[in-house]
Amino acid sequence: MEDFVRQCFNPMIVELAEKAMKEYGEDPKIETNKFAAICTHLEVCFMYSDFHFIDERGESIIVESGDPNALLKHRFEIIEGRDRTMAWTVVNSICNTTGVEKPKFLPDLYDYKGNRFIEIGVTRREVHIYYLEKANKIKSEKTHIHIFSFTGEEMATKADYTLDEESRARIKTRLFTIRQEMASRGLWDSFRQSERGEETIEERFEITGTMRRLADQSLPPNFSSLENFRAYVDGFEPNGCIEGKLSQMSKEVNARIEPFLKTTPRPLKLPDGPPCSQRSKFLLMDALKLSIEDPSHEGEGIPLYDAIKCMKTFFGWKEPNVVKPHEKGINPNYLLAWKQVLAELQDIENEEKIPKTKNMKKTSQLKWALGENMAPEKVDFEDCKDVSDLKQYDSDEPEPRSLASWIQSEFNKACELTDSSWIELDEIGEDVAPIEHIASMRRNYFTAEVSHCRATEYIMKGVYINTALLNASCAAMDDFQLIPMISKCRTKEGRRKTNLYGFIIKGRSHLRNDTDVVNFVSMEFSLTDPRLEPHKWEKYCVLEIGDMLLRTAIGQVSRPMFLYVRTNGTSKIKMKWGMEMRRCLLQSLQQIESMIEAESSVKEKDMTKEFFENKSETWPIGESPKGVEEGSIGKVCRTLLAKSVFNSLYASPQLEGFSAESRKLLLIVQALRDNLEPGTFDLGGLYEAIEECLINDPWVLLNASWFNSFLTHALR
């Protein structure tokens, strides 16, 4: 790699990179990937600035060669590549002369035309992930961020790319060339995998002072010091009689171990109450898409352009009216909000050039729906600590809800195949070792089974919505930005397709902490009549907005089209996890892999091919009241994926608690089935811990009902 860097980059860049690494005590000969990354970043910064000038009139111009005497000023000041002291001197001088706010971290460039500092990023990972790491690190709205990737993708603050198309294409081509050159020398894989996120310095510290005293005070009885306790724990032998061990640990414990027999466990008690309601951030089986095939319109790929194009494919719009009101909401406001979206989309079309983003007018209906000015005023603690009856708000206990059949239908639907493919196979380099060949084979088989699965559509929809919402929350904090809900797929014939599910309008989003909430209103198309299962749609106001002609076996039929509108909220940390929903594919692939491994170790050879290609064999999928359900290996893949996706879509404290506590009971039952004669103490306490998580969450209630089916069949 070191030789490659010295051949591939200009000697001046190599020298600057070496200097920078030495300044931080790093050796270019050892940390060769870092050496290459620094050179690449420097080169991109220089290319960004090259040929860009400001003429006498203050206009930005591009001059590749010409009159050396022309009165031209460089458009960009290059800060990257200077030693730290000099770089800060330049930054301070710019701030003093222009009045621009001083950044906390050294930026890479200053743009005299845009009057802003620019942070350039070059990433081997996904641009949006790297963009967010940068944004989180510099935490400044004033510094403009522009990220390039080696795959030709880019991302910039507010989608403002500063440079013209051609200059950016030069940079992308150069990055692509570097990647090709590395790949041809077998260096790319190691370089790609070596990228870490933005690093923060963490201090290591010994436990001293107050913390040490607290540690000593909180030891169990009969221990004099922390070291003494540590030595005991390290030497604790975990085998032998449980009662003896417990009494050895503490005099207060006297646990009677009860044998756990087939007749011991009882079913979990599910709550009574009204049926549970839908609480996902977007519609699942009830969603309706307006789609365009082979999109090639101007601005294709810009969400707003795509959305308008999709909206134009539907001709059955009609005067909207409320068909299922929201019990607690002001329903006319939801109606007005939809009308406002239609009107503002119409306004955009009447403009000469469609903007890349659309901020909605702050009307009274949107202010109400987005909870503007509804947060209680924050008061400094110093001003109110003397108030005698200062107390926290009383919050109501959540109302218990019973299991409703719709959540099982949602799950069944998520396991089904659609007629489109939602994921592409990543380009991964040639397999080198035999183990890589097996891994690629497993991945390809697995991808073939799940690429058309509806759960995979939910993953891509979730990734898109969360990325777009987090982006808008950072880039347009005060604006009510209109965000189309879009996904992309390929048809059976391999044609590209862009789908619009509806729109989100984001509220104010000054998100300082990970858990700070941004409110949004979602408006989603559907053909589902909400009056069939009104309990499912408790949190929604549903409008009828049009009539759609559908082709059926008996010819064309007209069906009413509905719009499901609700106020919702999310946080930075939830959006971050939402953006990483692709991990669900990995989790379910690993579960399948452990099944293949078990089979392979019995047969003492790799069973991947037989596992996926033996269509006659069936596998256990899950429990139902009818008994153990079985299905093909593809069905197993899709069921595992759907479970993982629903764990992400319906993530909640109730699910965390239920999963952790019910697992303990599951292990005891498994031990009984394996004739290990398990014993338990305080089984009642375990049931209590499980059942306190069964309150109102549809996914948790469904899992509890599956668990009961499992208990019934496991203990026959």
UniProtKB/Swiss-Prot annotation:
Entry binding sites for Mn(2+) 2: E80, D108
Source organism superkingdom: Viruses
Reported cofactor(s): Mn(2+)
Manganese listed as a keyword: yes
Keywords: Cap snatching, Endonuclease, Eukaryotic host gene expression shutoff by virus, Eukaryotic host transcription shutoff by virus, Host cytoplasm, Host gene expression shutoff by virus, Host nucleus, Host-virus interaction, Hydrolase, Inhibition of host RNA polymerase II by virus, Manganese, Metal-binding, Nuclease, Phosphoprotein
Listed Pfam families: Flu_PA
Annotated cofactor note: Binds 2 manganese ions per subunit.
Entry's localization field: Host cytoplasm; Host nucleus
Processing and modification events after translation: Phosphorylated on serines and threonines by host kinases, including human casein kinase II.
Record-level Gene Ontology MF annotations: endonuclease activity; metal ion binding; RNA binding
Motif extent (Nuclear localization signal 1 (NLS1)): 124-139
InterPro entries given in the database record: INFV_PA (IPR037534), PA/PA-X (IPR001009), PA/PA-X_sf (IPR038372)
GO terms under cellular component: host cell cytoplasm; host cell nucleus
Disulfide-bond pairs as recorded: none
EC top class, as a word: hydrolase
Annotated motif Nuclear localization signal 2 (NLS2), positions: 184-247
EC number(s) from the headed UniProt entry: 3.1.-.-
GO biological process: cap snatching; DNA-templated transcription; symbiont-mediated suppression of host gene expression; symbiont-mediated suppression of host mRNA transcription via inhibition of RNA polymerase II activity; viral RNA genome replication; viral translational frameshifting
Protein purpose: Plays an essential role in viral RNA transcription and replication by forming the heterotrimeric polymerase complex together with PB1 and PB2 subunits. The complex transcribes viral mRNAs by using a unique mechanism called cap-snatching. It consists in the hijacking and cleavage of host capped pre-mRNAs. These short capped RNAs are then used as primers for viral mRNAs. The PB2 subunit is responsible for the binding of the 5' cap of cellular pre-mRNAs which are subsequently cleaved after 10-13 nucleotides by the PA subunit that carries the endonuclease activity.
Subunit structure: Influenza RNA polymerase is composed of three subunits: PB1, PB2 and PA. Interacts (via C-terminus) with PB1 (via N-terminus).
UniProt similarity note: Belongs to the influenza viruses PA family.
Protein name: Polymerase acidic protein
Organism the protein comes from: Influenza A virus (strain A/Turkey/Ontario/6118/1968 H8N4)
